[in-house]
Regions:
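Extracellular glycan-interacting surfaces
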Residues: 1-156
Length: 156
């Protein structure tokens, strides 16, 4: 199953490799309108994460999780309200409970327990060169994370 954020206040799913798309019905459960980042949990395809915000670039942002492929949603507990829409979400295949989320304005959040609790990196984009893309070996400078194919390591 594929998931994609294609419009304001909705994400879509496809069961035929993208030939057709159906709305997941996020709009009836999530109050912040602009859906942006979508991520399926690496070890459990039932669990979907959604990053969104009030608009494409500004306002309040939020993170949500669905345990049932988008039928129901919960807002995740961030340590502070993001300074903009959550655009990027990433996980690590070796540790699917490790997630990164970044706002359009540079804040980076991390969880090691699949989203039950989050911390905010002290440094933001501009100081962190690579934050939410895992494709083999990556590293962040001046704080952030470093990983290869093993479980991720955080540096502050």
């Amino acid at each position: 199953m594929l998931f994609r954020s294609l419009s304001v206040r909705e994400i879509f799913s496809s069961t035929d490799n993208g030939a057709t798309w159906e709305p997941v019905q996020v709009r009836s459960q999530v109050s912040i309108p602009y859906c942006r980042g979508v991520l399926v949990k690496a070890d459990d395809p039932q669990v979907i994460y959604l990053g969104n915000g009030e608009s494409a670039f500004g306002g309040l942002g939020a993170l949500h999780r669905s345990p049932d492929r988008g039928q129901t949603w919960e807002t995740l507990p961030l340590p502070l309200a993001p300074n903009g829409t959550i655009w990027n979400l990433a996980t690590h295949a070796a540790d699917p409970d490790f997630l990164l989320a970044s706002s359009v304005n540079g804040e980076v959040f991390c969880t090691t327990d699949a989203g039950d609790s989050w911390s905010k990196f002290a440094r933001e984009f501009g100081e962190v060169l690579e934050s939410t893309r895992f494709r083999g070996a990556h590293q962040a400078f001046n704080g952030g994370c470093s990983d290869a194919q093993d479980a991720p390591t955080l540096f502050t």
